[in-house]
Swiss-Prot record:
<feature type="active site" description="Proton acceptor">
    <location>
        <position position="139"/>
    </location>
</feature>
<dbReference type="InterPro" id="IPR026954">
    <property type="entry name" value="PknH-like_Extracell"/>
</dbReference>
<dbReference type="GO" id="GO:0080090">
    <property type="term" value="P:regulation of primary metabolic process"/>
</dbReference>
<dbReference type="Pfam" id="PF14032">
    <property type="entry name" value="PknH_C"/>
</dbReference>
<dbReference type="InterPro" id="IPR008271">
    <property type="entry name" value="Ser/Thr_kinase_AS"/>
</dbReference>
<keyword id="KW-0808">Transferase</keyword>
<dbReference type="InterPro" id="IPR011009">
    <property type="entry name" value="Kinase-like_dom_sf"/>
</dbReference>
<keyword id="KW-0547">Nucleotide-binding</keyword>
<keyword id="KW-0472">Membrane</keyword>
<keyword id="KW-0418">Kinase</keyword>
<dbReference type="GO" id="GO:0106310">
    <property type="term" value="F:protein serine kinase activity"/>
</dbReference>
<feature type="topological domain" description="Cytoplasmic">
    <location>
        <begin position="1"/>
        <end position="373"/>
    </location>
</feature>
<dbReference type="GO" id="GO:0005524">
    <property type="term" value="F:ATP binding"/>
</dbReference>
<feature type="binding site">
    <location>
        <begin position="22"/>
        <end position="30"/>
    </location>
    <ligand>
        <name>ATP</name>
    </ligand>
</feature>
<feature type="binding site">
    <location>
        <position position="45"/>
    </location>
    <ligand>
        <name>ATP</name>
    </ligand>
</feature>
<dbReference type="InterPro" id="IPR017441">
    <property type="entry name" value="Protein_kinase_ATP_BS"/>
</dbReference>
<feature type="region of interest" description="Disordered">
    <location>
        <begin position="292"/>
        <end position="368"/>
    </location>
</feature>
């Protein structure tokens, strides 16, 4: 991409000397830049004044930067730093020399099935790592997938999409490109979970195999309608030679209902691998192995001079476009071992925007003279062996075992803890259970923030309504009388499938996290109470949160929710010295489920 008019090439931005414009989009610009203090080359994204001044955008982007900076996943480009300079937000990340997948597909057409699966497997690994840390990408598409000459794949732009496409899809010219990969629930008021990313990844798989996105339309309305109601296309019917088994993989990944999709991106990738013929499975494994062995993300630099083009001519699909730099070894000043540090906030700017248009080199490891090349080289060898082993394991891992049979409804009561088990956890000796509970609580409770009702109480009818659950069994335990010091409500809820149970917990986690730090007013039986939520701990399959009652002399409760097989475990433990009692009870119930 040439330096467009009004670019800031050649100027200084804080400590950065902006050397080359890499991309420009609706949110700002991306530059190759030299950090003049640290003496390394990075990619810097500069946000527009509009986004830099948006307080909601600023806070969400800071949070996403810290999370993305923590992700220890080789297929996520590390974020080094973020902040603002003279009121303009920026993001510093590793400079990666590569070509985005969209440009590869447009220039060379569809990929071979083994190569498509190898790339999808790597992106699935990045997504699963993000989802485990509570991050949704929300803009998975070929333009945000970067491919090196060795087919090492990176997923870029974590956090930016989630902060700008939640409720601000107003620029039609920019948004339509994203809408090609957007899950149906993104166009409605339904809850959006991590499975929207899985839908998008299935769309990308379809495009890798056929050369075109699943739905193409001249208008946004037609495109949205296709995602909501259109039949899911079959890759084998579009491009001869694609194994028919891919039709089922894409169909499940693009299921209209989130709960009908794969439970994880890795599950989708594994199913895609299984759809290949045996020779093609070996080919995909070779691609993965080669990409892992030839790429050293985050290793220390061993050369101060710009790299030269390899003497061996790479395949044409992997060649860099005219005007782009030659392929560079993945080297730079980041430590060769140990975790990538969480990015620090730079007092002086902000965040960058994704580049628009064609191929773009993205920040690979910064280049800097290293006085310890032997040490760095040794560390690089260790890392490449580890990554190679990971690639081999991913490609050649054994076929998945059959999932366990769903727990029968009549077995639910046996999963609950007995009185001695509850007393042991709560530090009491006289707690006794009441009558068994076999239906949801439909008491006329009013919560000022309705979405927080599930974070406050167990087995609530409004919370579970419409989720498809099939049965519930629960027990409430406390000391005798009205002046009890401990109170526990434990419930187990059966769903038709494990996927539906996991989807419910994921949805609950999203709602609980939105309640963190907030105070709600509860009206129950003509009485009013105020409860304040602490931060949510953990991520699905297990989440917990402590809520404290105002004016109750330290009375507080811990909510815990977990899932095992097709059973959701829903626990509330209350008392005056609450730590993680609900979490312990949930864990013990999960152990029982797993033994069924």
């Amino acid at each position: 991409m040439s330096d467009a008019q009004d670019s800031r090439v050649g100027s200084m931005f804080g400590p950065y000397h902006l050397k080359r414009l890499l991309g420009r989009g609706g949110m700002g610009e991306v530059y190759e830049a030299e950090h003049t203090v640290k003496e390394w080359t990075v990619a810097v994204k500069l946000m527009t004044a509009e986004f830099s001044k948006d307080p909601v955008f600023r806070e969400r982007m800071k949070r996403e930067a810290r999370i993305a900076g923590r992700l220890q996943e080789p297929h996520v480009v590390p974020i080094h730093d973020y902040g603002e300079v003279d009121g303009q937000m920026f993001l510093e990340m590793r400079l990666v020399e590569g070509t985005d997948l969209d440009s590869v597909l447009k220039r060379f057409g569809p990929l071979t099935p083994p190569r498509a699966v190898a790339i999808i497997t790597q992106i699935a690994s990045a997504l699963d790592a993000a989802h485990a840390d509570g991050v949704m990408h929300r803009d998975v598409k070929p333009q945000n997938i970067l491919i090196t000459r060795d087919d090492f794949a990176y997923l870029v732009d974590f956090g930016i999409a989630s902060a700008t496409t939640d409720e601000k899809l107003t620029q039609l010219g920019t948004a339509v490109g994203t809408w090609k990969y957007m899950a149906p629930e993104r166009f409605s008021n339904d809850e959006v979970t991590y499975r929207a990313d899985i839908y998008a990844l299935a769309c990308v798989l379809h495009e890798c195999l056929t050369g075109a996105p699943p739905y193409r339309a001249d208008s946004a309305g037609t495109l949205v309608s296709s995602h909501l109601m259109g039949p899911i296309p079959q890759p084998s019917a579009i491009r001869p030679g694609i194994p028919k088994a891919f039709d089922a993989v894409v169909a499940r990944g693009m299921a209209k209902k989130p709960e009908d999709r794969y439970a994880s991106a890795g599950d989708l990738a594994l199913a895609a691998h299984e759809a290949l013929s045996d020779p093609d499975q070996d080919h995909a494994a070779d691609i993965l192995r080669r990409s892992q062995e030839s790429t050293l993300p985050g290793t220390a630099a061993v050369t101060a001079q710009p790299p030269t083009m390899p003497t061996v001519t790479p395949p044409p699909i992997q060649a860099a476009p005219t005007g782009q730099p030659s392929w560079a070894p993945n080297s730079g000043p980041m430590p060769a071992s140990g975790p990538t540090p969480t990015p620090q906030y730079y007092q002086g700017g902000g965040w960058g925007a994704p580049p628009s248009g064609g191929p773009s080199p993205w920040a690979q490891t910064p280049r800097k003279t290293n006085p310890w090349p032997l040490v760095a080289g040794a560390a690089a060898v260790v890392l490449v062996l580890v990554l190679g082993a990971i690639g081999i394991w991913i490609a050649n891992r054994p076929k998945p075992v059959q999932p366990p049979q769903p727990v029968a409804e009549e077995r639910l009561s046996a999963l609950l803890l007995n009185s001695s088990e509850v007393n042991a956890v709560m530090g009491s000796s006289s707690m006794q259970p009441g009558k068994p509970i076999t239906s949801m609580d439909s008491s006329p409770v009013t919560v000022s923030l309705p979405d927080c009702q599930g974070a406050l109480y167990t087995s609530q009818d409004p919370v579970y309504a419409g989720t498809g659950y099939t049965a519930i069994n629960g027990l409430i335990s406390s000391e005798p009388g009205d002046n009890y010091e401990h109170w526990v409500n434990q419930a187990v809820v059966a769903f038709p499938t494990a996927d539906k149970a996991r989807a419910f917990v994921q949805t609950s986690a999203d709602k609980w996290k939105n309640c963190a730090g907030k105070t709600v007013t509860v009206t129950n039986k003509a009485k009013t109470y105020r409860w304040t939520f602490a931060d949510v701990k953990g991520s699905p399959p297990t989440i917990t949160v402590i809520d404290t009652q105002e004016g109750a002399e330290g009375w507080e409760c811990q909510r815990a929710m977990s899932v095992a097989n097709n059973v959701v475990v829903d626990v509330n433990a209350c008392g005056y010295q609450i730590t993680n009692q609900a979490g312990q009870i949930a864990a013990k119930i999960v152990d029982k489920v797993n033994k069924e």
